[in-house]
């Protein structure tokens, strides 16, 4: 994972959800802070560990969740930031 790729994943996802303007990216730290309002603050952190990469999601006043993949992390983030949004899948075929 590069800082640019991290920024592309996070900013592209939040732009698709219509909330990109609420995000402050720290590419060098592989983290971002999303502030929708004073009660909805979420931090997303990407880390490389000896056993593999992990995504940490910290919601204000909630227990941190840890995910082994970007897909799982984005699903969890969607449930926090867009709980009423319909969930779908994209299938790429060749």
Which positions does each model-derived feature cover?
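Serine/threonine-rich, low-complexity intrinsically disordered segments
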Residues: 36-37, 43, 47, 68, ...
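Negatively charged, low-complexity tracts enriched in Asp/Glu with abundant Ser/Thr
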Residues: 1-37, 60-64, 91-94
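Generic N-terminal initiation segments characterized by hydrophobic and/or small/turn-forming residues
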Residues: 3, 11, 33, 48, ...
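Ampiphathic alpha-helical segments that act as solvent-exposed interaction surfaces
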Residues: 58-94
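Short aromatic-glycine-(Arg/Gly/Cys) micro-motifs in beta-strand/loop hairpins
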Residues: 39-62
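Low-complexity, intrinsically disordered/propeptide-like segments
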Residues: 9, 17, 39, 77-80, ...
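Generic low-polarity alpha-helical segments
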Residues: 21, 42-43, 73-77
